[in-house]
């Protein structure tokens, strides 16, 4: 017997209707001094204001490299704060982050 591969929750609640980037802007404006990201192993603690500034800086840098809406940006990284920056920066410009398994060997990545 084949069963569905997804779960369907309450469909009566409407979608938010804003982008991830806009949601980050709103949260950072409302709670600029609250913790947004903590990476203990990197000794990093960024507030929403700091996080938003870093995300916007990275988004501008990606756009300067001609990354635009719909483009794919691959990241081959371990669990670091910068991974989260890439996720939000690509979302802000409408690009798609492609996560490459950091356990891949070079020859697997080349394939």
Segments (PLM) and residue ranges:
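Flexible, non-catalytic linker and terminal segments flanking ANL/adenylate-forming cores
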Residues: 1-18
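Conserved AMP-binding/adenylate-forming core of the ANL superfamily
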Residues: 16, 33-88, 105-111
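Hydrophobic alpha-helical segments typical of transmembrane helices
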Residues: 19, 23-24, 108
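Anion (oxyanion) recognition and catalysis
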Residues: 91
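Structured binding elements
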Residues: 94
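Short beta->alpha connector loops at strand-helix junctions that form conserved
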Residues: 100-102
